[in-house]
Amino acid sequence: MDEANHSVVSEFVFLGLSDSRKIQLLLFLFFSVFYVSSLMGNLLIVLTVTSDPRLQSPMYFLLANLSIINLVFCSSTAPKMIYDLFRKHKTISFGGCVVQIFFIHAVGGTEMVLLIAMAFDRYVAICKPLHYLTIMNPQRCILFLVISWIIGIIHSVIQLAFVVDLLFCGPNELDSFFCDLPRFIKLACIETYTLGFMVTANSGFISLASFLILIISYIFILVTVQKKSSGGIFKAFSMLSAHVIVVVLVFGPLIFFYIFPFPTSHLDKFLAIFDAVITPVLNPVIYTFRNKEMMVAMRRRCSQFVNYSKIF
């Protein structure tokens, strides 16, 4: 009888970020600039690494794949978010929501594991430089990449297993600009406290475990270098600085989200914007800004593109 009195929800409504037209315009400009910058920056890294024979090394192979992950991650939320800014009814189908959740968690999990692989690459380069190319051979690099994607996809499938069979009978409003899984689950017609806890625990585990492994790895590298040479620690820290900054950018919002005792809608939205729009732009900037070899290669690639354009 109860089921007959409820209609099954087939689409969800995003409440968005603001109803003010002026703020919407500012957000449109802000998100558009950052999204286009993210696309151009990460694509430039991928094209530069794949086309320049001087950059055919394990470090740049992993960096190019991180850029691909950034492209997929920001494209899973940013285009719809920009498209919805001026729409009165910001809707998404149940299937669209499931697809968005899958990509967000699959790519996010893959990125975390790939950062661990990049930390291992730095460990070998700094602590075992003579054996670097032997240890970080092409087969091992591909293995790292495959394992990263497998773990990311498994993590995402586990998350989806909690929600694909849920019944949604109303309300259907999400106080967000994308399919935020914890908020999505709360709209189900059943008691969702336990389910929400399991989903949060799954994401929290992979995030915290990856973060701890990375921090321990960086500390181990610095301690190892310190034992060999007191002066070498500054060079090691210089080589690791970009990686540490990226780790803070990736994991900072996640850790703050999980440990902050009084989460709010505004805080969650800010962290989501930072993670989805700003971080994918900063990653290529941070990794290339202090890398002279990469900067020279990117300038060379841009010059070739400009010269090619002039011909036509």
Swiss-Prot record:
The chain crosses the membrane at residues 26-49, 58-79, 101-120, 140-158, 196-219, 236-258, 270-289. Glycans are attached at residue 5. GO terms for cellular component: plasma membrane. InterPro entries: GPCR_Rhodpsn (IPR000276), GPCR_Rhodpsn_7TM (IPR017452), Olfact_rcpt (IPR000725), Olfactory_Receptors (IPR050427). One of its GO terms (molecular function) is olfactory receptor activity. Keywords: Cell membrane, Disulfide bond, G-protein coupled receptor, Glycoprotein, Membrane, Olfaction, Receptor, Sensory transduction, Transducer, Transmembrane, Transmembrane helix. It comes from the Eukaryota. Residues 1-25, 80-100, 159-195, 259-269 are extracellular. Disulfide bonds join 97-189. Residues 50-57, 121-139, 220-235, 290-312 are cytoplasmic. It is a multi-pass membrane protein. It is found in: Cell membrane. It holds the Pfam family 7tm_4. Odorant receptor. Belongs to the G-protein coupled receptor 1 family. This is Olfactory receptor 4F6. It comes from Homo sapiens. The lineage of its organism: Eukaryota, Metazoa, Chordata, Craniata, Vertebrata.
